[in-house]
Amino acid sequence: DLEQYSRQYPNRSDAMLVAVNDFSEAHYRSHANRVEVDLITALLGLKVESEYAGQGDLDFLDGQAKTTVPAIDFASTTVNPFLAIRKAVRLQSEKLGSGLAAKRTGVIIFAAGAAADGLSSNPLISDMVKYAGDASATALFTRMVDSNPAYDSFQIGGITVIDVSMFPEIVAHIGENGFAIVPVMDKAAQCYQLHSGVGVRHAELGQDAVLHHQYLIKDEFQFPSVVTETSYLPVNNIPQAIIFGSAA
């Protein structure tokens, strides 16, 4: 709708240029948000849903149950809840196997509700909490953490805890008072992958394997249109090493 731009830009060419730029940025934001949702689903939902890919939906668990640990009493003042977390991390090492465990560079806990509150304020572990800056992450969750300063994060004994209570798209996978323990892996291990593909909407453009493809086309009357397509497939190769639990 060029009418809204023509009030500020009397020159029609200028108005069309600004409109195209605005639509281009809006398209990119929309597609980036969609990619982030699918990365979360691959990492914490352990699947990829697809309406168009020839292989259909991908279940990284291949029908198996996800790895869980017993509920943890984060309100306990007699038994340190962090001991249960360390036990869960050891279970994660078993699921990874010795080869991949050696390539683990860190651990991130996505926690919500009572789990997040308990990890940050339980008196038995409060002296272990050291508030830090943005969590360092790699692979799939680089986009989720590093580019989202809204996430509250802190450190407990070398483990990064991220409070995601206010992010329903993540809480939907871990539960309102749940948590997920995710290993941060060396990129060379290729445990988390984001494959990019070619575009299909244009006969000549978009033939490189990149995440986003965007084209500017004009109709017979030279009115421009912005076309954006995103071709990607996130892959989680260590779904059993993502440990899930909840607050008791």
Segments (PLM) and residue ranges:
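Flexible, active-site-adjacent loop/turn segments at secondary-structure boundaries
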Residues: L46, G56-D59, I72, D117, ...
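Non-transmembrane, interaction-prone segments in cytosolic or luminal domains
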Residues: Q4-R7, H27-Y28, N33-L39, L43, ...
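Sequence/fold signature of self-assembling virion shell proteins
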Residues: S126-A248
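Long, contiguous amphipathic alpha-helices that act as assembly "spine/axial" helices in icosahedral shell
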Residues: D1-A65, N80, A84, R90-F110, ...
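Generic serine detector
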Residues: S6, S13, S24, S30, ...
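Amphipathic alpha-helical segments that form coiled-coils or helix-hairpins used
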Residues: G63-A75
